[in-house]
Amino acid sequence: LLQLSDIEVSFLSRNSISRHGLTTNLDKSKKLSSSNCKIKLNKKLFEEKYFLYAEFVLFHEYIHSLGNFSHDKNFRQLENLWPEKKQMNIIGRQLTRELQEIKAQWAWTCSKCGFVVKRSSRKFRSNYFHKECLGKLKNIPIIRPTSLEH
């Protein structure tokens, strides 16, 4: 475990929405190991409300750095050693939703019930529908106030 203290930890790019952590090789020509890896974390994890979840994400990335690359049965057994892992999954989904909300530039709005799904991409087909009420979805740009409008 002493090897883990030598692993470089930095931030993910600002545009990361669904990724909360990433373990990469320092030297791509060599196999990933605790001596040849770097861990990147989403900056949002350093907000006080996400501190406990940040510890879990770091634990998850440390499992990768110890040679468990895929999310297979062995990886999940190690990850399940974390106390209250189910709660961490809930917090992770909340963080993803918050990041989506911040980055959203488009909203898919249901014409029948008014349900809204915010999206960062404009990709849209006219035949999309809301699975709950079967209303047709419309793609609407989100207009954010500029700094001059404040």
PLM feature segments, named:
Residues L1-E48, L52, F69-H150:
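Metalloprotease/metallohydrolase-associated module, dominated by Zn2+-dependent proteases
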Residues F56-N68:
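Active-site recognition of the HExxH zinc-binding catalytic motif
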